[in-house]
Curated annotation (Swiss-Prot):
Full protein name: Proteasome subunit alpha
Pfam families (UniProt xref): Proteasome, Proteasome_A_N
Sorted UniProt keywords: Cytoplasm, Proteasome
Lineage, top ranks: Archaea, Methanobacteriati, Thermoplasmatota, Thermoplasmata, Thermoplasmatales
Entries under SUPFAM superfamilies matching the protein: N-terminal nucleophile aminohydrolases (Ntn hydrolases) (SSF56235)
Family: Belongs to the peptidase T1A family.
InterPro entries referenced in this protein's UniProt entry, alphabetically: Ntn_hydrolases_N, Proteasome_alpha, Proteasome_alpha-type, Proteasome_asu_arc, Proteasome_asu_N, Proteasome_sua/b
Keyword Cytoplasm: yes
Gene Ontology CC annotation, any one: proteasome core complex, alpha-subunit complex
Amino acid sequence: MQQGQMAYDRAITVFSPDGRLFQVEYAREAVKKGSTALGIKFKDGVALISEKKVRSRLVEKTSLEKIQLIDDRVAAVTSGLVADARVLIDFARISDQQEKVTYGSLMNIENLVKRVADQMQQYTQYGGVRPYGVSIIFAGLDSIGPRLFDCDPAGTINEYKCVSIGAGKDQVTAYLEKEYKENLSEDEAIRMGIAALKSAVADESSMKEPEIASIKMGETFHVFTSEEVSKYLN
């Protein structure tokens, strides 16, 4: 570590002379060590796909859920520190339900993402805390149609047609930039997403049973069963 950098990475609220917040950069590095996942829009919906790393044969595979439902029309996939991800997913669910109790309807997906991003951003500017070491892809439907957002440790939000997070982000992004076309069918989008993940994942065993979930207009989010996933792996 450079001597000049050491003076500015001890406190999260201190900028370096060149305008960097080192603790936020370190949080992004934690995300780069996480599982690779992606979101991809298709003609009338959006899908989430994630590799599934099983560190030991003693682990129950059913306990390793990367894709989380926020409600029946919004889901999220995370990469980075698992505990941080759990806290933020719970925060999103509680915020969503509070909106329903207060106003009689669930929160618009864009507002929900902004609420989570605000929470993440707050942890980049107060002493005594650290940034969340996780990035989240949110996918769902609203009155506009299929929506797909990415939120990083700094609380930055972007909306995409397709997006990736995790260790293989750069390779997946390069693949999708070359191959992605609008108005794909659900089947085409899922097959493209799996191909993109396979191009980036070093451990082939993590793609033996990836997690997949999708939602189409007029329907609710569907998490694919093992049998449904297997047809995309042949």
